């Protein structure tokens, strides 16, 4: 019975739980709010597990579909479904939300109910965006998740939180208005808002495709974010609380890249081929130049934020590598796998930074040193995540990057060679930070007073470590889910619409 409504449950359980948490009222009821938030996040995660276990790896198209009329007059419907790509993001989002609720358990003392509720509501909205089969429904969820994210940064962020949250809101909103225009144009062509109908349009002139490409691209590129519209991300990460940074890096950035896969590539294949060289150049700039920028950062959060931009450059590179008019198989699948891996690794890195910040209240690398002497268990976990961020084999960080590099070499050796620089830069800035923070003499007397991770922090880091190692040692479990959906997308993009 419930199998027919799994996606609706994945969307609405967190949202309803968020409303219930809000209803707990003042801070004096914080323990109740935390327990309700944990129950809601856990239920939201558990309901996504049948999506993975029950997913048919051999069949293409959408599964677990739901359809209900929403606004019949405008042919706008509540239509849901997941394919081999989106199903992984729904599960990842629910998983990270559970980790975020645990991460903020004892840390957030100011308005904890509202804090937990914002994450739960945002989780449901993000799941809605990943599962939507109606373009206007996607737009509502895609834009709606900005409101709780804006509040998370603006209320619980650092000293410059208002600046960071407003910058984030303006950047993303300006791009999204153009996407709305493009969606309305396409709806006139097919008489509705079904994304599959958009994808199955037989003929779109190249000039129109190019205009639509620009409209969609500006919206999704800001969300990824791609160079040069990336400047909001470091500010947002630095000011956001730990949970905000975890969700921002692990989930929110993936919405932009998912938009490329769901809208731009299948609906506008000729424009995608036309603009592919531009996307490749911008992606390589993100991989190489932003990697160099990360090398000179003194703030740990800002360093990992620039690292995220560099890794997401790898993702967009993999999505736009064409050979004889066809998308490269290895690169496309590698891009999706890299997104899932980055979700685990970036969340873990920001969790590690949050653990240290909670003890010393500074993110400056120079304020640390010798942490291994007082926090050996924490140092071991951070070593694993730092290695994964650098792309060490047997960790999840290696799999997607290796697949994209293999695909890039098939397209052009020099593109592959430049892309491979991310392995060098990733190791350089990540291990440089790790060495200065964890090893060496205790430079700050306050470091000597730091306590090792408690049971709650150990549990969060251990679960993330299992995810990073599990995906690195057995990536086939993820690749086989993505395989058929990626092949269907490649076949679709190969057909010209001119």
Question: Could you describe each region identified by the protein language model?
Answer:
Residues 18-23, 49, 98-102, 124-128, ...:
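Alpha-helical transmembrane segments of multipass membrane proteins
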